[in-house]
C-alpha cells in the first residue's frame, strides 16, 4: 500500500503533467490557427479571354512588386501551346515540352532565378488540352499537384503572382474550374481586359462572375490589343464606371512588351501594394 504522502505526490504530478499537456495542446492549436490565418499573399491574374495579355500583365505586376522591394515569384500552373490539332491519345508526361512562351516570359520577369518546373505544373503543346481534360478524355490534371506546387513556392517566396489559363471559368479538370481553385486558395484576382470590339460585355460578365464566386477583385488592367480601335478612351471611361474595382493601369500596343520594363504602365499600384503589405 502507498503512503498518503506518496499518493499526494503522485496526484500532484498528474495534475502538473495534465496542466503542462493542456498548455502544449493550446499552443499547438494557436500555431495552427495562426498558420491558417497568416496565409502567404498570392494573387491570381485572369482575363476576359485567351490572348488578352495576361502574361504581359503578370510581367508588369512582377516588375512593379520587385521595384517596391517585394520578394516575389510568378507561377503558371497550366501552360498550353499553339498547336491547334486535336490530341489523339493521353499524355504520358506532365511536360510535353519546357519551352512554353508564357512560362519563359514569367521566368524572365521574376527578380530572382527560378527553374521552369518550379513555376509551372503542366505544359502541353495542344491549345485544346483544357477542353479535353475537362471531359477526362486526354489528361486528368491533378488539383493536388497544383496545390503542392503553389505551397512549395509559398514556402520559399513571401509573395506569389499566379497566372491563369484562358478565361475565368476555364476548367482545370472534369471536377474543378480555375474559379473554384482560386476561391479554395483564398486568392484575390486582377482582371485583364483586352481592349477590342465587344470587350465591354466580356469584361462585365467576367467581373460579375469573379465577385459571384466570392473572390475579391482587387482591380483590372486594360491591355490595348487592337491599335486601330476607335473610341479607345471612351471604352476605358465606360469600363471604369461599370467595373466596381479600380483601374490599375493601361498597357499600350507596343512591340515586344515581353522584353520591356512595364512598370510605368501600372499607374495605380496602390491596391496591389496594400494587399501584399498585409
UniProtKB/Swiss-Prot annotation:
What EC number(s) does the entry state?
6.3.3.3
Choose any GO biological process term that the UniProt entry carries and state it.
Answer: biotin biosynthetic process
- Look up the record and name the cofactor or cofactors this protein needs: Mg(2+)
User: Which residues constitute the catalytic centre?
Assistant: 76
Catalysed reactions, as listed in the record: (7R,8S)-7,8-diammoniononanoate + CO2 + ATP = (4R,5S)-dethiobiotin + ADP + phosphate + 3 H(+)
Q: Which residues bind Mg(2+)?
A: 55, 102, 163
Disulfide bond residue pairs: none
Instruction: Write one Gene Ontology MF term.
Output: ATP binding
Write out the entry's keywords from A to Z.
Answer: ATP-binding, Biotin biosynthesis, Cytoplasm, Ligase, Magnesium, Metal-binding, Nucleotide-binding
Q: Which residues bind ATP?
A: 51-56, 102, 223-224, 252-254
Q: Where in the cell is it found?
A: Cytoplasm
By its UniProt entry, which Pfam families does this protein fall under?
Answer: AAA_26
The pathway that the record names for this protein is: Cofactor biosynthesis; biotin biosynthesis; biotin from 7,8-diaminononanoate: step 1/2
CDD domains to which the protein is assigned, alphabetical: DTBS (cd03109)
A GO cellular component term found in this entry reads:
cytosol
Give the family this protein belongs to, as stated in its UniProt record: Belongs to the dethiobiotin synthetase family.
Q: What does this protein do?
A: Catalyzes a mechanistically unusual reaction, the ATP-dependent insertion of CO2 between the N7 and N8 nitrogen atoms of 7,8-diaminopelargonic acid (DAPA, also called 7,8-diammoniononanoate) to form a ureido ring.
Q: How does it assemble?
A: Homodimer.
NCBIfam families, per the entry: bioD
Name assigned to this protein: ATP-dependent dethiobiotin synthetase BioD 1
Amino acid at each position: 500500500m502507498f503512503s498518503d504522502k506518496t499518493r499526494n505526490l503522485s496526484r500532484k504530478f498528474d495534475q502538473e503533467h495534465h496542466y503542462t499537456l493542456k498548455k502544449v495542446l493550446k499552443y499547438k492549436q494557436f500555431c495552427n490557427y495562426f498558420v491558417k490565418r497568416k496565409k502567404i499573399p498570392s494573387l491570381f491574374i485572369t482575363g476576359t479571354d485567351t490572348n488578352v495579355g495576361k502574361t504581359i500583365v503578370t510581367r508588369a505586376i512582377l516588375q512593379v512588386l520587385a521595384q517596391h522591394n517585394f520578394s516575389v515569384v510568378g507561377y503558371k500552373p497550366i501552360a498550353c501551346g499553339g498547336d491547334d490539332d486535336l490530341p489523339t491519345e493521353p499524355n504520358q508526361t506532365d511536360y510535353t515540352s519546357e519551352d512554353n512562351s508564357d512560362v519563359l516570359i514569367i521566368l524572365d520577369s521574376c527578380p530572382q532565378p527560378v527553374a521552369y518546373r518550379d513555376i509551372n505544373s503542366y505544359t502541353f503543346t495542344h491549345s485544346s488540352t483544357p477542353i479535353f481534360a475537362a471531359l477526362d478524355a486526354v489528361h486528368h490534371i491533378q488539383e493536388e499537384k497544383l496545390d503542392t506546387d503553389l505551397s512549395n513556392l509559398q514556402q520559399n517566396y513571401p509573395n506569389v503572382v499566379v497566372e491563369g489559363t484562358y478565361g475565368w471559368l476555364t476548367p482545370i479538370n472534369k471536377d474543378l474550374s480555375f474559379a473554384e481553385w482560386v476561391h479554395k486558395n483564398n486568392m484575390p484576382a486582377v482582371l485583364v481586359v483586352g481592349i477590342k470590339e465587344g470587350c465591354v460585355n466580356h469584361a462585365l460578365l467576367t467581373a460579375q462572375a469573379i465577385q459571384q464566386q466570392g473572390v475579391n477583385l482587387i482591380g483590372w488592367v486594360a491591355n490595348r490589343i487592337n491599335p486601330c480601335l476607335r473610341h479607345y478612351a471612351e471604352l476605358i471611361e465606360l469600363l471604369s464606371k461599370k467595373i466596381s474595382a479600380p483601374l490599375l493601369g493601361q498597357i499600350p500596343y507596343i512591340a515586344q512588351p515581353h522584353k520591356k520594363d512595364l512598370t510605368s504602365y501600372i499607374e495605380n499600384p496602390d491596391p496591389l501594394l496594400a494587399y501584399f503589405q498585409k
